[in-house]
A protein has these predicted regions:
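N-terminal small-domain helix-loop-helix segment of the aminotransferase-like
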Residues: 6-97, 104, 278-280, 387-388
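Helix C-cap/helix->beta junction micro-motif
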Residues: 26, 133, 191-192, 342
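Conserved core of the PLP fold type I
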Residues: 59-187, 204-208, 212-219, 374, ...
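PLP-dependent enzyme catalytic core of the Aspartate aminotransferase-like
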Residues: 77, 81, 154, 337-346, ...
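Walker B catalytic acidic pair
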Residues: 200
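Conserved core segment of the aminotransferase class I/II
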Residues: 221-290, 300
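Conserved glycine-rich beta-strand-loop-beta hairpin in the small C-terminal domain of fold type I
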Residues: 275, 292-300, 312-325, 362
Length: 388
């Protein structure tokens, strides 16, 4: 009989990280495009604020399970402005990172043997948590443009379906789901009285300046929508683990049970930093967004050198480019070979699909947020000489 953790696979970032253990990259420097996280610390003004905040007694004590009221209120205020409707403070909860927000959502929505629909390729940590929770993942294959089809999703709904989970902008594909597609999924979920979990971790790097969707403008949206967010990317607070969950007050009452049992309260320093960032770093964040968009454009402009070799750019946006390689070699073997031959570390598409799905063997993810436009050109020049 397997334990809960034995029901799932090894974390992909850790697994591919072992490929570089003991390797010498002094002659050919490693290009690491495996992990979607800022490697730089928070901006200096935020670090200085945190240095002062750590002197406050409250920073070191337990706080409310659902997070600091001031941070919940600020999210409600800014989200209401961004999405064009009123979100209440009581509809906002703070979690220890966005992965915990997803875990809490599943604990609140699902029981043993229930089902959640995930578009494939999926964000692997979502699949891992569903495995460990005893919840079945129902794969929803995406189209060639990496957009999930609501009509196909409808055919997958059963009496055990409890939620559809979307990530937009997407991880691993980078694709921004059009508002009409998001709305179609909302209507589908509402019709079947299931939840629509929408993870918007990369919302701050969306290419459009307007509302990415209008879910929050729907009557009684909180009976269907479970919105997830991360402060890790926006303010480089990866190590401080601060996320958010927005849904109905009733559902947050159930989420509170999970959070109180697992972590008691979110990190106080991280919450204070997130609040200060929201109130003081809007212009800085705009600059971060523009830089990510410049790198996205560098991916698009520079990909021709790979297209000529048979590669295909399947999706690009936020922190990611998702590509198809031209070789017969499976992507998990190819990616390990890229480390040895070309000093490139990336994650193969096989790690974004259920076991037995052959689709990922031709695909891989490039997390480009941590490399410059110059390094993007270097990456492509190396990939252009890749071989089996």
């Amino acid at each position: 009989m397997s334990s809960r953790t034995e029901l799932t696979f090894t974390p992909p970032v850790m697994e591919v990280g072992r490929w570089i253990d003991g390797k010498d990259f002094s002659k050919l420097p490693l290009i690491n495009v495996s992990q979607a996280a800022p490697v730089a610390p928070p901006p200096r003004p935020l670090i200085e604020y945190m240095a002062n905040a750590i002197q406050e007694d409250s920073t070191h004590l337990y706080g409310p399970v659902l997070g600091l009221p001031e941070l919940r209120s600020e999210i409600a205020k800014q989200w209401s402005r961004a999405y064009g409707d009123t979100i209440k403070t009581t509809q906002v909860g703070i979690t220890s990172g966005c992965n915990q927000a997803f875990s809490a959502s599943i604990a609140m929505l699902c029981g043993e043997g229930d089902e959640v629909i995930l578009p494939t390729p999926f964000y692997f940590n979502h699949k891992m948590w569903l495995d460990m929770a005893g919840v079945s993942t129902i794969a929803l294959p995406c189209s060639g443009k990496m957009i999930p089809d609501p009509a196909l999703a409808a055919s997958l709904i059963t009496g055990r379906t409890r939620a559809i989970a979307l990530v937009t902008p997407n991880n691993p594909c980078g694709v921004e789901y059009p508002p009409n597609v998001v709305m179609a999924f909302y209507q589908l979920a509402r019709k079947h009285r299931i939840a629509l979990i929408i993870d918007e971790t990369y919302r701050d790097f969306h290419s459009a300046l307007g509302m990415p969707h209008n879910l929050f403008q729907q009557n009684e949206w909180d009976e269907t929508v479970v919105h997830l967010y991360s402060f890790s990317k926006a303010y480089r607070l990866t190590g401080h683990r601060v996320g958010a969950l927005v849904t109905s007050e009733k559902r947050l009452g159930e989420v509170e049970k999970f959070l109180d049992t697992v972590s008691i309260c979110p990190n106080q320093l991280g919450q204070k930093a997130a609040l200060w960032g929201m109130q003081n770093l809007s212009e800085w964040l705009k600059g971060e967004r523009l830089e990510i968009l410049r790198r996205k454009q560098a991916i698009i402009d520079g990909f021709e050198v790979l297209s000529d070799k048979g590669w295909q750019l399947l999706g690009v946006g936020a922190y990611f480019a998702y590509v198809q390689h031209p070789f017969s070699l499976a992507s998990n073997e190819l990616c390990e070979k890229l480390v040895d031959d070309l000093a490139i570390l990336t994650i193969p598409g096989t790690m974004f699909f259920p076991e037995g799905d052959e689709t990922g063997k031709r695909q891989l993810r490039i997390a480009f947020a941590n490399i410059s436009t110059t390094e993007i050109k270097l990456l492509f020049s190396r990939l252009a000489v890749a071989s089996e």
